[in-house]
Structure formats: C-alpha cells, structure tokens
C-alpha cells in the first residue's frame, strides 16, 4: 500500500493512473503526524488498518474510477489531524499542547514507541526517546553511527530539524521597501536555532533500497513527500538554508530514536514546560520564514525524569 517510487513516498495502488498519491503533510503543523503515518504504513504494509472510524483502505479502493487518489488524499489528511489531536492532549507530560504550535517531540516519541511495538517483531522491547544533539564534531559522528544502526535493524528514526529565526539567503530587499533590512537580517540569522520540522529516516531494506553508505540515510521529507539519501555528516552552514532532505533547514537539533525499554525517558518539568510555551509564544509573531513545528529547541534547558 505504501512504497517509494521515483524518490517519492506513494500510497495506494499503482495499477492505474489516479489511484496512488504522494503522502505529504496536510498543513504547516502536521509534519510530525505525517512522519508517524508514513512509519505506520511502511512498517505494516499488509495490515488492514482502518485509517479512520469512517473509511478503511478497502473502501477507499472501491471509489469511483479516477477518484481513488482524491479519496485517499482526503482520508490521509483527516488521519493526520486525528493523530495530531491524540498527540496534543498530553503534549508535554500531563499538559496539553496547542495545535498551532505543531506537536512536541515527546508526543512523537510516544507514538513511535506504539507503532514499532505493534508493527515490528520484538518491537515491544524498544522505546523511543528524545535526545538533543549537536550536529557537528565527533559526538555527532557517533550519533550518526547510532542512527544508522537502528535503520539497519529495521527501525525508523525521527530527526528534528531547524535553524535561526531568519535564514541568510544573501537576498536583501532594497532599503525603504518595508522588508527586513540587511543588518537586521544578518542579526536574526545569528540567533539560536529554533526547531521547525520533522523528517523520518527510513530503514533502507524497508523501502527496498541498498545501504546508502557510510554516514548516509534515506530521509522522508513530509512537506514534499520526497525520499532521498543524505550525508548526515556533511558540513552545513547553520545560518543559511539547508538541504531539501531536511526541509530546507540547516540543523539537526534532536533525534527521536529507539533504545532499550528499560531506559527511562526524560520529560520537561512543569516549570520548564511553561517556560517553553511562553518563550515560543513570543517567537511566533517574529518568525519570518515559514516553519512547520513552531516550538523552540531550547537546547540549554535542563530536563529530568
């Protein structure tokens, strides 16, 4: 039902034109739920999973000729929003999370744990956790090795990407045009990185591909539906636009990766959670470039169990 065709994640039957669609996020806040949906469809291809309480895959396939793809598109869009609502009820520990701010990495981790436990052999022994990372230096190299080890074992990994408030594109509007001036743009391009997007690293055997090579991973990018290999260890300017495989963002700020179920997951305390919400609420009105997940990485915040 879901497979990679021509570097796109396609969902549906491929026997006739108009039956399959490229799985993409339905709006600017659903990159997280779309990654989760992609993981579920790829890990359980034979499962007769009712995507909603109203419509199953079999019912979608019985649509009028030429309308099957449109039917699937509507079905998957509704499912993304359902996943998001379920995640955000307890987005930060016991606290709810507003839809306008996307989804938190901890709720994504919980959902990934559930998906893997039900869709992969021995998945119940794995629990997904959030780990904030620095995407450069020897420590990042070791992190990439860990990511690739999970992928080689058939387990997907979610990457949290982002960048500064404004990306330095070297395209500055003329003075007096009402746009951000060159000095302000340069200053904003040097601000701390903000988490903006989720992408899904895919096990290569799951998508019928060979190992992409040392340091590389196949990444599903939900805004375009593309699946391409990227060298995660390649140097990237943290102030400029990043590769399309990372959604155009230059930084990897966190990884949501499987570990032994006996390991505990760190959750933000209530005071830190409220600081996170308050700080991000202030940022929303100042975000110049479009983003998906609009919560802040806050790499310096302390987390505890």
Where in the sequence are the language-model features?
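Active-site signature of cysteine proteases
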Residues: 150-152, 162-305
